[in-house]
């Protein structure tokens, strides 16, 4: 009994010593403090989406042009087989996580029955003038488990007040409509193209604006924060995610998620900087790579044979997602109101190729040595 007692007595300081050493060891490998800007939870969730679709569809689809002037008759918008469920199914099957729709492009034509203008689908023959394309897409996205994003062009070549303070009120009213009537929005997309020639209510003139100050962006962004607090705000300079500085499907091999955000705005002239970000950036503003599956953003029958090759599509994935960006692939809706068969086939091929690439786990069985663990 005496021996056992002595051994137990000696164990106590030994165990205490082990405890002290363990505590010191843990202290030595505490997680380091973050260096510089870090992503928000919303930015992390957005980055993990990897791929999502851009949908360009408007009067331009029926006039065979890219940028509408703002003077075309709404009755030209007349899809015969429009099916947002087909769009959503194509995207879901491809592994895309969401869809961003051009609710209003530069010509000012609205794909929802806005109460603030007559230049919308309510003046078209589609659905007898009672349709709401944004609503139909919202419902299709919910059915297929996809997120919905909204593109709203700041420039409006149809509106008579563009270039005046009154237009900003109009623009914000439409933004509120889109952010309150269609459920949760994951991204709001503001284009950098602003100002130039247009119909402008019949004046047919050139109107230039100060892209940096005209829209009073900070107060415009506040509307999004208020109505859709989890939505990502996209423009050339963020504030949440940025343009990649080209429409060719790549971001720089060195691609910082940082940006000196206060120096950049929608329509920023030195946009080539955005291909790489700023190593000394003040804010976390990751890059989004937007590219079309065809040469144009809107559908043109003449481009049916110009769809990007499988190799091009796979290369774009690795030059976007593979370089610390996201991949926003544009699918132009055709005159029927469908994703064209040629485009669908190419997307399916890309999905199969990427799946094959990632089937083999190259890290399986590898040995990893760490100098410190916690």
Question: Each predicted region: which residue ranges?
Answer:
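Positively charged n-region of N-terminal signal peptides that target proteins for export
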Residues: 6-13, 91
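Mature catalytic domains of secreted/periplasmic carbohydrate-active enzymes
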Residues: 29-374
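Sec-dependent N-terminal signal peptides
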Residues: 13-22
């Amino acid at each position: 009994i005496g021996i056992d007692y002595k051994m137990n007595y000696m164990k106590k300081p030994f165990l205490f010593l082990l405890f002290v050493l363990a505590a010191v060891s843990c202290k030595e490998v505490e997680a380091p403090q973050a260096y510089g800007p870090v992503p928000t939870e919303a930015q992390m969730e957005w980055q993990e989406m990897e791929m999502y679709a851009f949908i360009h569809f408007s009067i331009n689809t029926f006039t065979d042009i890219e940028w509408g002037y703002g003077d075309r008759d709404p009755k030209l918008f007349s899809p015969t087989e429009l099916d947002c469920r087909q769009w959503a199914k194509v995207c879901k099957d491809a592994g895309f996580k969401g869809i961003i729709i051009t609710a209003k492009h530069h010509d000012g034509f609205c794909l929802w029955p806005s109460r603030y203008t007559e230049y919308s689908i309510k003046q078209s023959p589609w659905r007898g003038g009672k349709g709401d394309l944004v609503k139909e897409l919202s419902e299709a996205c919910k059915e297929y488990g996809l997120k919905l994003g909204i593109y709203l062009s700041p420039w409006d070549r149809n509106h008579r007040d563009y270039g005046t303070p009154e237009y900003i009120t109009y623009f914000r009213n439409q933004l509120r409509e889109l952010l309150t009537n269609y459920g949760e929005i994951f991204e709001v997309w503001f284009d950098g193209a602003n100002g130039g020639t247009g119909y402008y209510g019949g004046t047919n003139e050139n109107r230039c604006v100060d892209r940096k100050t005209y829209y009073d962006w900070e107060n415009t962004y506040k509307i999004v924060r208020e109505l859709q607090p989890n939505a990502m705000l996209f423009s050339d300079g963020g504030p949440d995610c940025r343009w990649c500085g080209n429409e060719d499907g790549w971001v720089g091999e060195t691609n910082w998620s940082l940006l000196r955000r206060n120096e950049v705005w929608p329509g920023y002239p030195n946009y080539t900087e955005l291909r790489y970000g700023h190593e000394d950036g003040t804010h976390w503003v990751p890059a989004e790579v937007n590219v079309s599956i065809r040469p144009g953003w809107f559908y043109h029958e003449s481009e049916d044979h110009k769809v990007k090759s499988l190799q091009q599509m796979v290369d774009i994935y690795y030059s976007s997602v593979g370089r610390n960006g996201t991949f926003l692939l544009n699918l132009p809706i055709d005159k029927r109101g469908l994703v064209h068969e040629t485009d669908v086939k190419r997307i399916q091929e890309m999905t199969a190729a990427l799946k094959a690439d990632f089937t083999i786990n190259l890290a399986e069985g590898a040995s990893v040595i760490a100098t410190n663990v916690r």
